[in-house]
Amino acid sequence: MSTVKEKLIENLIEEDKISQRKITIVGTGAVGMACAICILLKDLADELALVDVAVDKLKGEMMDLQHGSLFFNTSKITSGKDYSVSANSKLVIVTAGARQQEGESRLALVQRNVNIMKSIIPAVVQHSPDCKMLIVSNPVDILTYVVWKLSGLPATRVFGSGCNLDSARFRYLIGEKLGVHPTSCHGWIIGEHGDSSVPLWSGVNVAGVALKTLDPKLGTDADKDQWKNIHKQVVESAYEIIKLKGYTSWAIGLSVTDLVGSVLKNLRRVHPVSTMVKGLYGIKEEIFLSIPCVLGQNGVSDIVKINLNSDEEALFKKSADTLWNVQKELVF
């Protein structure tokens, strides 16, 4: 006897079961789920897979998203503890890791999260050998290096969310000070995603007007408007949010989704993401730091060669030294 489905639908051809824009998110904590909902609402994936060790929470998050399927255009949402669920992903986003505690620097997290990466990355690569990997877990620059080493993938296909969020915060705060929307305020933060990040005051502009031409002291101690406090706010903002609500989630979820769009749509937009900087600006070690990168379907296809002034270059090198002093002690 025919089923209702058989009476209703006649199959004509077998469809290709391999997704064209499959995304896997490893880690379904606050950051992972913020990434998930932003990606779904932007219609960036035709399949979304969630992976976590907390099986009950994982199933609950999957069901909660599936029940909202009417309101977005991703046809398949799956989850599992086993990495086979991530097979054939175009992009794997790693958010798993120990959460940063109130007052804890991102660098203090490092060895705990290195050990977590060792349990994740080989399985990811086994099931998706052609994927790009976007690392979000903190400290993101060092963990991007660790993932690159563990994965065996080309450095161009492993990149960290890096200073994309720092730069977004920077532009928001500049806009607040000027009364202008952040999309019209242009400025970059490079280096470490964290305490030693480097604001490029020399490039800050609105409508092509460099603020440094209006006040050469902009961003320095001699600046009467104290613009340097904006960078201080950028550095301290995550700590403040963690103190207030326990974690950060929404802004990083939006920032990651911004990067995902550039990769899956092959937009070739320029983002400050964490990439290999050995050989740049006098850096001799295998360090990952944020510099402006062209992001597309192959990952990081190009870097933009910024002309740093002497102060900016010194700060960038200091940022590299800060990370190297931690990174060289890692065991993995």
UniProtKB/Swiss-Prot annotation:
Pathway: Fermentation; pyruvate fermentation to lactate; (S)-lactate from pyruvate: step 1/1. It catalyses: (S)-lactate + NAD(+) = pyruvate + NADH + H(+). PROSITE patterns: L_LDH (PS00064). Its main location: cytoplasm. NAD(+) binds at residues 29-57, 99, 138. One of its GO terms (molecular function) is L-lactate dehydrogenase activity. Possible role in sperm motility. Homotetramer. Interacts with RABL2/RABL2A; binds preferentially to GTP-bound RABL2. This is L-lactate dehydrogenase C chain. It comes from Vulpes vulpes. The lineage of its organism: Eukaryota, Metazoa, Chordata, Craniata, Vertebrata.
